[in-house]
Structure formats: structure tokens, C-alpha cells
Amino acid sequence: MSKLFIPYIMGDLNFIHHLKTLTENGADIVEIGVPFSDPVADGPIIMKAGRNAIDEGSNIKFIFDELIKNKNTISSKYVLMTYYNILSAYGEELFLDKCDEAGVYGLIIPDLPYELTKKFKKDFYHHSVKIISLIAMTASDARIMQIAKNSEGFIYTVTMNATTGNSGEFHPDLKRKIEYIKKVSKIPVVAGFGIKNPEHVKDIASVADGIVIGSEIVKRIEIDSRKEFITYIKSIRTTLNSL
């Protein structure tokens, strides 16, 4: 199986354009951030993009409407990254109905603890959308096994004990943790948070089944030309294909 490339984009008014660009240039799954006023798990770059998206008028209704209109023209899978407040305010059942209608593959809910995630999946088992589990590098082996056993879609490992986009070294125990998670998991294990360049990708994806790139993608969408952006995306895809 080829390594998974999962870029993150903010769900702003142009997100469908960015989604299609990524899909056409090697993304396997695209993570779409739902803009939120208090994004506790986001670093400054994604936080700023979220504020801008809110200011220009984007919201979860707009995101669902655009996905429903365009789902048949998008070849990659896509997941929504949303805080529980948005889901709760929308109504859990209605939110998941819309996910099904919009072709959403999975949900990442970073502020929903594992115990509540397990209950959530049990309550809404009849929906096709998958609830993606996150595992921090600080989690014990027992905790990892517990989460992995009940995970679906893919497992998202947080490669640094920090918010997204934070520069610096990856956790020194990273590879051992990822290898252990893979050992106890029946689904792909991807790594994210802090990955920026092909060197990072080569290092992490030598053990992980794929990578998530968030802040670097969001930053490049803002500052790069379309040609530069596509060149960067292709460099990540090429690196993954070489492993």
C-alpha cells in the first residue's frame, strides 16, 4: 500500500478550489477544517486562517452545501476537522445526516475525549461517516491499545506534544510509539502536527502509513503562486512514493 498523503485546508470560501487542486496532485485524503472561534488545538497559522474564514462568511452550512454540490467531481476522500461545539450546536444527528449527504469520509473531533468518542460512535453507528481517533505520543501503551482497538478509518498520531505547526524536533520516542500503534492497529496509522518538508516526511513516513500536513499547506496556500504550491504538493507525493 502506498503511503497516505493527507493535507489540511481551512474551510474558507475557496476551499473547494484548494480541495480539487490537492486531489488532482496526489492527496489521498483531504482534511477540511471547520472555522471556529475558539480553536484550542490549532497553531497560529491555522488559527489566523480560521478567523479569516469566519470574517469572510464561511461556516459549516457553507461547507456542507459546497461539498454536496461538488462531491461527484472530487476523487479523493475528505474528512472534516471540527470542534464538538459546532457539532453540538448544529445537532448531532442532523450533522451526521449532512456528512452522509456530503460524502464526508470521516470526522476528527480533537476536543472529544476517547470515552465520549466511543459513546458517540455507539449512539450513531447507523451513519457511514467514520470517527477518526487521535493518539498523543504521551499516551501509555495500555491507552494506545484501548484506543486502537476501537478506531476506524485511520489513526492520527500526534507527533509532538504541542499544538499544530509548532517548529522544533519531533518527539524522541516517536518511531517506537508509531511502530507500537501499528502493531496493535488493523487500520492505517498516520502522523501529523509539525510536518513541513520532504525531509520530515521521509523521516516520519519511514515508519508511519502516511502523513498529515496542516500549517505548512495553509501557509503556502496564502503566499505561494499556484505553480509553486503544486510543485510543493508534488514533492511531498514523490517523497511518499519513494518509501
Swiss-Prot record:
UniProt GO molecular function: tryptophan synthase activity
Reaction(s) catalysed by this chain's protein: (1S,2R)-1-C-(indol-3-yl)glycerol 3-phosphate + L-serine = D-glyceraldehyde 3-phosphate + L-tryptophan + H2O
Entry GO CC: cytosol
Sorted UniProt keywords: Amino-acid biosynthesis, Aromatic amino acid biosynthesis, Lyase, Tryptophan biosynthesis
CDD domains, per the entry: Tryptophan_synthase_alpha (cd04724)
EC code: 4.2.1.20
Subunit and interaction comment: Tetramer of two alpha and two beta chains.
Family label: Belongs to the TrpA family.
Protein name from the UniProt record: Tryptophan synthase alpha chain
Gene: trpA
